[in-house]
């Protein structure tokens, strides 16, 4: 498939969706390309039920609600959407009147010519960060091992081990502590990389006995047969 567009947006997460809105106000047509099979980026793929508190004018909304609002916002404007497509090459082409355009090709055979490319891919296509010293953690995938939280209800009244020291680990520790039977937060360092406010909330939960904090530890082994039954640190 070959076509031309005013603006090609690589990444259909919140920034990519808002780019369609801003371009629409200028009367420009956008084409969105994303490696995932849905719009919303990490908000939809990794933590659709995660509360977001830092959107101006919106006290609180979930990540999926934020994506849904952006989709609603761009409905008046014309745009094309190509999902499950990974950009593999971007080549400059100089026309006869000395104007540079770009030819973008995807792994599924799309070839798009455009004068403008907006790269809104965030950290890139999502790849799980697996424990480096576990031979095959994915053998328990969906049976005790998960790399994202699609539904908070799946973890209600469960004994949870959360590994990590960034925003996602801290955010989900605070959020799931409301409904989980127990939560153990494990990090290989004593220092955390997440927002200070969320870290303070986590430490309050530790002091009140709602979260068990284990640092500095790494996961050495996942125990179980068909399902996870425990871990070795």
Segments the model singles out, each with a brief description of its role:
Residues 2-37, 141-195:
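Rossmann-like dinucleotide/flavin-binding elements
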Residues 52, 67, 74, 127, ...:
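A general structural signal for well-ordered alpha-helical segments in protein cores
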């Amino acid at each position: 498939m070959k076509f031309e567009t005013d603006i090609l947006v690589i990444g259909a997460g919140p920034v990519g969706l808002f780019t369609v809105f801003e371009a629409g106000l200028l009367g420009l047509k956008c084409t969105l390309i994303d490696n995932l099979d849905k719009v919303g980026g990490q908000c939809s793929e990794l933590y659709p039920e995660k509360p977001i508190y830092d959107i101006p004018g919106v006290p609180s909304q979930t990540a999926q609600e934020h994506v849904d609002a952006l989709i609603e916002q761009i409905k008046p404007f014309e745009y094309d959407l190509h999902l499950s497509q990974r950009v593999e090459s971007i080549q400059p082409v100089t026309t006869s009147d000395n104007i540079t355009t770009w030819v973008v090709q995807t792994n599924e055979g799309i070839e798009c010519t455009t004068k403008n490319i907006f790269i809104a891919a965030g950290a890139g296509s999502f790849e799980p960060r697996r424990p480096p010293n576990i031979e095959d953690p994915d053998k328990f995938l969906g049976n005790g091992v998960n790399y994202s939280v699609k539904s908070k209800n799946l973890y209600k009244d469960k004994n949870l081990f959360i590994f990590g020291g960034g925003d996602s680990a801290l955010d989900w520790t605070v959020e799931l502590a409301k409904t989980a039977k127990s939560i153990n937060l494990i990090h290989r360092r004593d220092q955390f990389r997440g927002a200070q406010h969320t870290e303070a909330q986590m430490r309050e939960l530790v002091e009140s006995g709602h979260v068990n904090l284990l640092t500095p530890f790494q996961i050495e082994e996942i125990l179980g047969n068909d399902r996870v039954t425990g871990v070795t640190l």
